[in-house]
């Protein structure tokens, strides 16, 4: 993930631990890369749900007594929770930190055009690698829903639609590969001399 690239790294948030994923993203952003995180509602937090909800409710009580509109601002959406976690790991008040944070995009669900893009995972932040089997964890989506996020059902509905569409696309691509392979086998004898010439130039 090192080096500069105009193309964004698309990360699938499903099954990652919030803090560990945010730490990796912060480092990558400061190196100059663009990062897009999809399916933020399926990011995990270690510890049982009740404990995490109590911590979040305690955070909701933190406000300015004189004028609460001054902040701190309590984001409920999973994508904004991830964004704020990453912000805490970046020197966001400096110009370098501001530009790094501008390179981050986080989404609930998997909107176009990222539904057709290749998505990657971060092994160092995956729950199955970081937590012992049997340890308790909860989903950011459930926590957000319980503290005021209103779009869980909408995101679920759109995700189900996307998955059905994805299965159909996979079946079509599989069929297309099979037809292409069969067509190649049919004309293999006819095209053998031409194939030999092409391979002599180093192409396969």
From Swiss-Prot:
The keyword Transcription does not apply. Belongs to the universal ribosomal protein uL13 family. One of its GO terms (biological process) is negative regulation of translation. The gene is RpL13A. The keyword Metal-binding does not apply. SUPFAM superfamilies: Ribosomal protein L13 (SSF52161). NCBIfam families: L13_A_E. This is Large ribosomal subunit protein uL13. GO terms for cellular component: cytosolic large ribosomal subunit. Keywords: Ribonucleoprotein, Ribosomal protein. Disulfide bonds: none annotated. Pfam families: Ribosomal_L13 (PF00572). GO terms for molecular function: mRNA binding; structural constituent of ribosome.
């Amino acid at each position: 993930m090192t080096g500069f690239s105009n193309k964004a790294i698309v990360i699938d948030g499903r099954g990652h631990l919030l803090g560990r994923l945010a730490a990796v993203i912060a480092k990558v952003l400061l190196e100059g890369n663009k990062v897009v995180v999809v399916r933020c509602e399926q990011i995990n937090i270690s510890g049982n749900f009740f404990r995490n909800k109590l911590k979040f409710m305690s955070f909701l009580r933190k406000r300015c007594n004189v004028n609460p509109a001054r902040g701190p601002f309590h984001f409920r959406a999973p994508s904004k929770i991830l964004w704020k976690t990453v912000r805490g790991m970046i020197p966001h008040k400096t110009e370098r930190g501001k530009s790094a944070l501008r390179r981050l995009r986080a989404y609930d669900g998997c909107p176009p055009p990222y539904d057709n893009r290749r998505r990657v995972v971060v092994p160092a932040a995956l729950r199955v690698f970081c937590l012992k089997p049997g340890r308790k964890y909860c989903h950011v989506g459930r926590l957000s829903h319980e503290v005021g996020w209103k779009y869980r059902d909408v995101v679920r509905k759109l995700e189900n639609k996307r998955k059905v569409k994805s299965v159909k696309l996979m079946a079509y691509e599989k069929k297309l590969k099979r037809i292409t392979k069969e067509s190649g086998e049919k004309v293999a004898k006819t095209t053998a001399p031409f194939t030999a010439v092409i391979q002599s130039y180093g192409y396969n």
